[in-house]
Protein backbone atom coordinates (compact mmCIF):
# COMPACT_ATOMS: atom_id res chain seq x y z
CA UNK A 1 0.00 0.00 0.00
CA UNK A 2 1.44 3.38 -0.96
CA UNK A 3 0.69 6.44 1.16
CA UNK A 4 2.03 9.97 1.29
CA UNK A 5 3.18 11.22 4.70
CA UNK A 6 6.45 12.93 5.59
CA UNK A 7 8.60 12.88 7.70
CA UNK A 8 8.67 9.42 9.29
CA UNK A 9 5.98 8.92 11.92
CA UNK A 10 5.27 6.20 14.43
CA UNK A 11 2.59 5.74 17.07
CA UNK A 12 -0.19 3.62 18.52
CA UNK A 13 -3.82 3.58 17.45
CA UNK A 14 -6.63 1.83 19.35
CA UNK A 15 -9.24 0.08 17.21
CA UNK A 16 -12.55 0.33 19.08
CA UNK A 17 -16.16 -0.58 18.32
CA UNK A 18 -19.05 -2.82 19.22
CA UNK A 19 -18.83 -6.56 18.45
CA UNK A 20 -18.87 -7.80 14.86
CA UNK A 21 -18.20 -4.54 13.00
CA UNK A 22 -14.95 -5.80 11.45
CA UNK A 23 -12.26 -4.45 13.78
CA UNK A 24 -10.04 -7.50 13.40
CA UNK A 25 -10.59 -7.66 9.64
CA UNK A 26 -9.51 -4.01 9.45
CA UNK A 27 -6.44 -4.67 11.61
CA UNK A 28 -5.42 -7.64 9.44
CA UNK A 29 -5.93 -5.63 6.25
CA UNK A 30 -3.76 -2.75 7.47
CA UNK A 31 -1.04 -5.07 8.78
CA UNK A 32 -1.13 -7.13 5.59
CA UNK A 33 -1.16 -10.41 7.53
CA UNK A 34 -3.49 -12.38 9.76
CA UNK A 35 -2.78 -11.37 13.35
CA UNK A 36 -6.39 -11.39 14.61
CA UNK A 37 -8.88 -14.20 14.08
CA UNK A 38 -12.20 -13.43 12.40
CA UNK A 39 -15.62 -15.07 12.20
CA UNK A 40 -19.24 -14.08 11.75
CA UNK A 41 -19.85 -14.68 15.45
CA UNK A 42 -19.93 -11.59 17.71
CA UNK A 43 -17.14 -11.23 20.30
CA UNK A 44 -14.70 -13.34 18.30
CA UNK A 45 -11.87 -11.18 19.65
CA UNK A 46 -11.45 -11.75 23.38
CA UNK A 47 -7.93 -10.44 23.95
CA UNK A 48 -6.17 -7.17 23.32
CA UNK A 49 -3.31 -7.57 20.85
CA UNK A 50 -1.05 -5.40 18.73
CA UNK A 51 -1.00 -5.48 14.95
CA UNK A 52 2.07 -3.74 13.51
CA UNK A 53 1.51 -2.00 10.16
CA UNK A 54 4.74 -0.70 8.63
CA UNK A 55 4.89 1.64 5.63
CA UNK A 56 7.76 3.59 4.02
CA UNK A 57 6.43 6.76 5.65
CA UNK A 58 5.78 5.41 9.13
CA UNK A 59 4.52 2.70 11.42
CA UNK A 60 1.10 2.27 13.02
CA UNK A 61 0.86 0.03 16.07
CA UNK A 62 -2.80 -1.01 15.99
CA UNK A 63 -4.37 -2.11 19.27
CA UNK A 64 -7.10 -4.57 18.28
CA UNK A 65 -9.66 -4.99 21.05
CA UNK A 66 -12.70 -7.04 22.07
CA UNK A 67 -16.00 -5.44 21.07
CA UNK A 68 -17.49 -3.11 23.67
CA UNK A 69 -20.84 -4.52 24.75
CA UNK A 70 -23.44 -4.05 27.46
CA UNK A 71 -23.51 -7.70 28.58
CA UNK A 72 -21.89 -7.82 32.04
CA UNK A 73 -23.33 -11.02 33.53
CA UNK A 74 -20.23 -13.20 33.26
CA UNK A 75 -16.77 -12.38 34.51
CA UNK A 76 -15.50 -13.00 30.97
CA UNK A 77 -17.69 -10.18 29.60
CA UNK A 78 -16.38 -7.81 32.24
CA UNK A 79 -12.79 -8.81 31.50
CA UNK A 80 -13.26 -8.20 27.75
CA UNK A 81 -14.78 -4.77 28.34
CA UNK A 82 -11.87 -3.89 30.64
CA UNK A 83 -9.42 -4.95 27.93
CA UNK A 84 -11.16 -2.75 25.37
CA UNK A 85 -11.21 0.29 27.66
CA UNK A 86 -7.64 -0.32 28.79
CA UNK A 87 -6.41 -0.26 25.20
CA UNK A 88 -6.88 3.52 25.17
CA UNK A 89 -4.19 4.13 27.77
CA UNK A 90 -1.24 5.89 26.17
CA UNK A 91 -2.40 5.72 22.54
CA UNK A 92 -1.90 8.60 20.13
CA UNK A 93 -5.22 8.18 18.32
CA UNK A 94 -8.20 5.88 18.03
CA UNK A 95 -10.36 4.41 15.30
CA UNK A 96 -14.07 3.96 15.92
CA UNK A 97 -15.29 1.20 13.61
CA UNK A 98 -19.01 1.07 12.80
CA UNK A 99 -21.07 -0.78 10.21
CA UNK A 100 -22.41 1.17 7.22
CA UNK A 101 -26.10 1.90 7.65
CA UNK A 102 -26.27 0.90 11.31
CA UNK A 103 -25.78 2.77 14.58
CA UNK A 104 -27.12 1.34 17.83
CA UNK A 105 -26.71 1.67 21.60
CA UNK A 106 -23.41 -0.20 21.67
CA UNK A 107 -21.99 2.18 19.03
CA UNK A 108 -23.02 5.03 21.31
CA UNK A 109 -21.29 3.27 24.22
CA UNK A 110 -18.08 2.94 22.19
CA UNK A 111 -18.20 6.63 21.21
CA UNK A 112 -18.65 7.69 24.84
CA UNK A 113 -15.67 5.60 25.91
CA UNK A 114 -13.57 7.29 23.23
CA UNK A 115 -14.82 10.74 24.21
CA UNK A 116 -13.57 10.16 27.75
CA UNK A 117 -10.13 9.17 26.43
CA UNK A 118 -9.45 12.62 24.92
CA UNK A 119 -7.56 11.38 21.86
CA UNK A 120 -8.30 12.21 18.20
CA UNK A 121 -10.84 9.76 16.79
CA UNK A 122 -11.13 8.65 13.17
CA UNK A 123 -14.52 7.22 12.22
CA UNK A 124 -14.24 4.17 9.98
CA UNK A 125 -17.53 3.16 8.36
CA UNK A 126 -16.90 -0.45 7.41
CA UNK A 127 -18.77 -2.88 5.14
CA UNK A 128 -19.81 -0.20 2.64
CA UNK A 129 -19.71 -2.93 -0.02
CA UNK A 130 -22.72 -4.55 1.68
CA UNK A 131 -24.83 -1.40 1.59
CA UNK A 132 -27.59 -2.16 -0.91
CA UNK A 133 -28.60 1.46 -1.45
CA UNK A 134 -25.35 3.35 -2.05
CA UNK A 135 -27.20 6.68 -2.06
CA UNK A 136 -27.98 6.12 1.63
CA UNK A 137 -24.30 6.37 2.61
CA UNK A 138 -23.90 10.17 2.64
CA UNK A 139 -27.08 10.81 4.68
CA UNK A 140 -25.95 8.10 7.12
CA UNK A 141 -22.52 9.73 7.49
CA UNK A 142 -24.17 13.10 8.11
CA UNK A 143 -26.48 11.58 10.72
CA UNK A 144 -23.66 9.85 12.59
CA UNK A 145 -21.41 12.93 12.49
CA UNK A 146 -24.08 15.29 13.81
CA UNK A 147 -23.09 16.42 17.30
CA UNK A 148 -19.96 14.24 17.28
CA UNK A 149 -16.41 15.33 16.49
CA UNK A 150 -14.12 13.15 14.38
CA UNK A 151 -10.63 13.91 13.10
CA UNK A 152 -11.62 12.23 9.82
CA UNK A 153 -14.34 9.99 8.40
CA UNK A 154 -13.52 7.08 6.09
CA UNK A 155 -15.99 4.72 4.39
CA UNK A 156 -14.12 1.45 3.75
CA UNK A 157 -14.46 -2.22 2.98
CA UNK A 158 -11.82 -3.89 5.12
CA UNK A 159 -12.62 -7.29 3.61
CA UNK A 160 -12.07 -6.04 0.06
CA UNK A 161 -9.29 -3.64 1.10
CA UNK A 162 -11.11 -0.62 -0.32
CA UNK A 163 -10.51 2.89 1.05
CA UNK A 164 -7.55 1.89 3.21
CA UNK A 165 -4.86 4.04 1.58
CA UNK A 166 -6.57 7.31 2.49
CA UNK A 167 -7.26 5.98 6.00
CA UNK A 168 -3.58 5.16 6.55
CA UNK A 169 -2.59 8.63 5.36
CA UNK A 170 -4.86 10.31 7.91
CA UNK A 171 -3.79 8.01 10.74
CA UNK A 172 -0.12 8.73 10.09
CA UNK A 173 -0.86 12.44 10.41
CA UNK A 174 -2.20 11.83 13.93
CA UNK A 175 0.83 10.00 15.32
CA UNK A 176 4.08 11.78 16.28
CA UNK A 177 7.27 12.12 14.29
CA UNK A 178 9.32 9.22 15.59
CA UNK A 179 11.34 6.18 14.66
CA UNK A 180 9.56 2.85 14.30
CA UNK A 181 8.85 1.02 17.57
CA UNK A 182 9.11 -2.41 15.94
CA UNK A 183 11.21 -3.97 13.19
CA UNK A 184 9.95 -4.08 9.60
CA UNK A 185 9.34 -7.84 9.74
CA UNK A 186 7.36 -7.77 13.02
CA UNK A 187 3.58 -7.99 12.65
CA UNK A 188 2.37 -8.55 16.23
CA UNK A 189 3.50 -8.51 19.85
CA UNK A 190 1.87 -11.88 20.50
CA UNK A 191 3.77 -15.17 20.58
CA UNK A 192 3.28 -18.07 18.19
CA UNK A 193 1.91 -20.02 21.14
CA UNK A 194 -0.86 -17.44 21.64
CA UNK A 195 -1.63 -17.30 17.92
CA UNK A 196 -1.88 -21.09 17.76
CA UNK A 197 -4.60 -21.03 20.43
CA UNK A 198 -6.47 -18.30 18.59
CA UNK A 199 -6.40 -20.25 15.32
CA UNK A 200 -7.94 -23.28 17.03
CA UNK A 201 -10.61 -21.02 18.55
CA UNK A 202 -11.31 -19.50 15.14
CA UNK A 203 -11.99 -22.93 13.68
CA UNK A 204 -14.27 -23.77 16.60
CA UNK A 205 -16.42 -20.78 15.70
CA UNK A 206 -16.32 -21.48 11.98
CA UNK A 207 -17.10 -25.19 12.23
CA UNK A 208 -19.72 -25.08 14.98
CA UNK A 209 -21.41 -21.75 14.24
CA UNK A 210 -24.50 -21.30 16.40
CA UNK A 211 -23.89 -24.70 18.03
CA UNK A 212 -20.69 -23.44 19.66
CA UNK A 213 -21.11 -22.99 23.42
CA UNK A 214 -20.27 -19.42 24.44
CA UNK A 215 -18.12 -20.67 27.32
CA UNK A 216 -15.42 -22.23 25.15
CA UNK A 217 -11.74 -21.35 25.23
CA UNK A 218 -8.44 -22.84 24.09
CA UNK A 219 -5.27 -23.42 26.10
CA UNK A 220 -2.00 -24.39 24.42
CA UNK A 221 -0.58 -27.06 26.69
CA UNK A 222 2.47 -27.85 24.59
CA UNK A 223 4.41 -25.82 22.00
CA UNK A 224 7.80 -27.24 21.08
CA UNK A 225 10.17 -27.20 18.12
CA UNK A 226 11.28 -30.64 16.96
CA UNK A 227 13.76 -29.93 14.20
CA UNK A 228 11.75 -28.40 11.36
CA UNK A 229 8.48 -29.53 12.97
CA UNK A 230 6.32 -27.66 15.49
CA UNK A 231 4.58 -29.96 17.98
CA UNK A 232 1.51 -28.30 19.44
CA UNK A 233 -0.98 -29.62 21.98
CA UNK A 234 -4.25 -27.68 22.33
CA UNK A 235 -6.89 -28.17 25.03
CA UNK A 236 -10.41 -26.95 24.25
CA UNK A 237 -12.16 -26.09 27.50
CA UNK A 238 -15.95 -26.19 27.92
CA UNK A 239 -18.18 -26.06 31.00
CA UNK A 240 -20.38 -29.16 30.63
CA UNK A 241 -20.15 -32.73 29.34
CA UNK A 242 -22.91 -32.03 26.81
CA UNK A 243 -20.83 -29.22 25.34
CA UNK A 244 -17.86 -31.56 25.10
CA UNK A 245 -19.92 -33.95 22.96
CA UNK A 246 -20.91 -31.10 20.64
CA UNK A 247 -17.29 -30.09 20.05
CA UNK A 248 -16.07 -33.65 19.49
CA UNK A 249 -18.90 -34.62 17.15
CA UNK A 250 -19.99 -38.09 16.09
CA UNK A 251 -17.01 -40.42 16.12
CA UNK A 252 -14.70 -37.44 16.68
CA UNK A 253 -15.27 -36.13 13.14
CA UNK A 254 -15.93 -32.53 14.15
CA UNK A 255 -12.85 -32.27 16.37
CA UNK A 256 -10.76 -33.79 13.58
CA UNK A 257 -12.07 -31.18 11.12
CA UNK A 258 -11.35 -28.35 13.58
CA UNK A 259 -7.81 -29.59 14.20
CA UNK A 260 -7.06 -30.19 10.53
CA UNK A 261 -8.09 -26.72 9.41
CA UNK A 262 -6.38 -25.03 12.36
CA UNK A 263 -3.17 -26.91 11.54
CA UNK A 264 -3.20 -25.66 7.94
CA UNK A 265 -3.68 -22.08 9.16
CA UNK A 266 -0.76 -22.49 11.58
CA UNK A 267 1.52 -23.84 8.86
CA UNK A 268 0.63 -20.88 6.64
CA UNK A 269 1.24 -18.33 9.41
CA UNK A 270 4.34 -19.90 10.97
CA UNK A 271 5.96 -21.10 7.75
CA UNK A 272 6.65 -24.53 9.25
CA UNK A 273 5.16 -28.02 9.37
CA UNK A 274 2.89 -28.51 12.38
CA UNK A 275 1.88 -31.64 14.29
CA UNK A 276 -1.26 -30.66 16.19
CA UNK A 277 -3.05 -32.66 18.86
CA UNK A 278 -6.36 -31.49 20.32
CA UNK A 279 -8.30 -32.54 23.42
CA UNK A 280 -11.61 -31.39 24.89
CA UNK A 281 -11.89 -31.05 28.67
CA UNK A 282 -14.54 -29.82 31.10
CA UNK A 283 -14.09 -27.16 33.79
CA UNK A 284 -17.39 -26.09 35.26
CA UNK A 285 -18.05 -22.36 35.57
CA UNK A 286 -14.68 -21.20 34.22
CA UNK A 287 -16.17 -18.27 32.27
CA UNK A 288 -17.46 -16.67 35.49
CA UNK A 289 -14.34 -17.41 37.55
CA UNK A 290 -11.76 -14.59 37.67
CA UNK A 291 -8.97 -16.98 38.72
CA UNK A 292 -9.73 -19.40 35.87
CA UNK A 293 -9.87 -16.54 33.37
CA UNK A 294 -6.46 -15.32 34.51
CA UNK A 295 -5.06 -18.86 34.21
CA UNK A 296 -6.37 -19.03 30.64
CA UNK A 297 -4.63 -15.75 29.74
CA UNK A 298 -7.52 -13.29 29.94
CA UNK A 299 -6.30 -9.85 30.99
Curated annotation (Swiss-Prot):
Domain Era-type G residues, every copy: 9-177
Keyword Repressor: no
Topology with respect to the bilayer: Peripheral membrane protein
Binding site for GTP: 17-24, 64-68, 126-129
Main location: cytoplasm
Molecular function via GO: GTP binding; GTPase activity; ribosomal small subunit binding; small ribosomal subunit rRNA binding
Recorded superkingdom: Bacteria
The KH type-2 domain, residue ranges: 200-284
Region G2: start-end pairs: 43-47
Region G5, residue ranges: 156-158
NCBIfam families (UniProt xref): era (TIGR00436), PRK00089.1 (NF000908), small_GTP (TIGR00231)
PANTHER family xref list: GTPASE ERA, GTPASE ERA, MITOCHONDRIAL
UniProt subunit comment: Monomer.
Name of this chain's protein: GTPase Era
Organism field: Xanthomonas oryzae pv. oryzae (strain KACC10331 / KXO85)
